[in-house]
Every structure is written in C-alpha cells, then in structure tokens.
C-alpha cells in the first residue's frame, strides 16, 4: 500500500513514465535533485537532515540577503518571514530568545523610525549598486515602518529573552552618525533627530532593565559584557524547534535550523554571561552607571 502511494505521488508530481518510476523506487536509477526536492516537500522529509547524515560537519544556511535590485521588497519579505515564524510559536510556553550583540539589536531599535532609517541608509550607502548618496534622499515606504514595528512586537512575545551587549553598542552607532555628519551626508537637523531617537531608546532600555519584563509580562535579562564581541549571534527556540542567526552585512542575517549549529551557538552565547554583569532587576548601581555613560556618549553628537 505504501509502495503504491509513493508510486502514485511520483507519477502525479513528476510526469514521468511508469517504468521510470519503478526503476527509481527500486533504486536502480537515482532521483534527480529536482525530483528529490518535490518529494521532500510533499512528504515532509528534510533533505537538510538527510544530507547532514553523510556530511556531519556541514550545516545548511539561508542567506536572507537584501538584494540591491529590489531593496525594500526583499527587506520587507525577510522581516515578514520572521514575523510569521514568531507568530506561529508565540503561544508556546517554552519560547526563548537570546542575543549576544556588538551593535544595537534590531529587536530593540527598529520601532524608532529615524534611527532605523539611518541603519538602512548606512547599508545602502555602502552598497555601490544603490544610488542613495544623502540621508535626506532616502524615502522609506510606510509598509517598512509597519513591518519593523510588527517585528519588534513579535520578539516581545518570547517567554524569556537574554540580551548580552558589548559595552560599546551605543558608541558604534554614535561614531557612524558622526562620520556621516562630518562628510555632509547627514544634516545637522537630521543628526539631532537621530540623537533624539537614541536618547529615547536609552530611556526605554533603562526602564526595561529596571523592570526585567516587557509590557507583555515576558521576562527579559540584560547583561553588559566586559569583553568585546566580534559579531552578533542570536537564537530563538522552543522545546521542539529552533533557529540560529548570525548578523552579516549590517542589516542581514544568515540563519540555520541545523541541530549541531544551534547547540554550538547557544552554548557560545550563554557562556558570555561569565564575562558579563547583569543589569536587569538586580545590579542597580551598574545599571545607572551604564545608561548614564551611554547618554554622555550620545550627547557628544
């Protein structure tokens, strides 16, 4: 019965002859990659895991790279994919997210329109294929601002979240803003608007650290590292699923659902707590000092 079902599926989906199907099912002729992909999708078989059985040291990554030919559409599609994925697990009581970050995490700043616009502008300016030479020239579609806020909202649905920050997370963005201001690509007026967003974000984060909870009631733990990070690593997990993320090219991240990569990345992120000070709920003096230092850095703009 199972053999007959497989034969019928192969014939229906691949439009190949009866004898050709028999030879494939008997193993006399290998399936092509295209045929294997169709069967994988129809039967819910993971080709990644099948391949991983033979190549145990390899992991398959999704690049999630924003294309310069259709920048806003691909960026919107990537954020939409994350929003939908997080929405699917939001009711799971085991959800957890963790990020070790050397830049301001997107999950915290994307709801601020001017600040998020600056991050997009920086990426576009670096990309020679995109003609965007001044901050004023960049017009962000309204749907981008909306999906960014949806993304922030969905990350706050995780039952527990750990943020481990490099102690220069604000310094990095302040230097970027100052650079673009000095080469006259960001006006003084726009610089002040970005500065206002940064100060507002600082106030929000200090309040968040004091409470140790989002407005959703979900737990947040914030740590400040005493060592520098070379990259930003994140993961989102439930009791039966997970995804690992590594930040690349400023606004992009490569992702994988590989089990081995997840275990390794989670272990690395959690190990950074040994070099860090928790400033959420406890550590009031360290918390006050850290955020006052960030305001001083921002006010140099």
Each language-model region and where it sits:
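A short, basic/aromatic helix-end/turn motif that makes direct DNA contacts
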Residues: 14-15, 44
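Recognition helix of helix-turn-helix/homeodomain-like DNA-binding domains
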Residues: 15-32, 38
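DNA major-groove recognition helix of helix-turn-helix/homeodomain DNA-binding modules
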Residues: 34-50
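Helix-turn-helix/homeodomain-like alpha-helical modules used for DNA recognition
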Residues: 55-133
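Hydrophobic protein-protein interaction segments
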Residues: 122-291
């Amino acid at each position: 019965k199972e053999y007959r079902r497989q034969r019928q599926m192969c014939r229906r989906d691949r439009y190949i002859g009866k004898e050709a199907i028999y030879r494939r099912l008997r193993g006399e002729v290998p399936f092509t990659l295209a045929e294997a992909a169709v069967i994988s999708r129809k039967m819910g078989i993971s080709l990644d895991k099948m391949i991983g059985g033979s190549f145990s040291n390899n992991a398959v990554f999704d690049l999630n790279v924003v294309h310069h030919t259709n920048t806003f559409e691909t960026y919107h599609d990537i954020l939409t994919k994350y929003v939908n994925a997080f929405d699917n697990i939001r009711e799971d009581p085991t959800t957890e997210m963790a990020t070790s970050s050397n830049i301001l995490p997107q999950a915290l700043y994307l709801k601020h329109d001017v600040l998020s616009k600056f991050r997009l502008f920086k990426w576009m300016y670096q990309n020679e294929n995109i003609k965007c030479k001044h901050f004023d020239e960049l017009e962000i579609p309204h749907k981008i601002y909306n999906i960014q806020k949806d993304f922030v909202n969905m990350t706050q649905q995780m039952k527990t979240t750990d943020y481990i920050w490099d102690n220069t997370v604000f310094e990095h963005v302040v230097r970027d803003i100052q650079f673009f201001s000095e080469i006259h690509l960001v006006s003084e007026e726009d610089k002040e608007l970005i500065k206002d967003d940064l100060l507002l974000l600082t106030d929000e984060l200090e309040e968040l650290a004091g409470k140790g909870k989002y407005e959703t009631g979900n737990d947040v733990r914030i740590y400040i590292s005493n060592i520098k990070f070379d990259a930003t690593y994140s993961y989102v997990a439930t009791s039966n699923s997970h995804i690992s993320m590594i930040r690349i090219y400023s606004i992009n991240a490569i992702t994988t659902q590989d089990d081995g990569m997840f275990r390794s990345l989670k272990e690395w992120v959690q190990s950074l707590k040994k070099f860090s000070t928790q400033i959420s709920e406890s550590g009031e003096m360290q918390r006050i000092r850290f955020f006052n230092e960030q305001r001083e850095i921002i006010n140099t703009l």
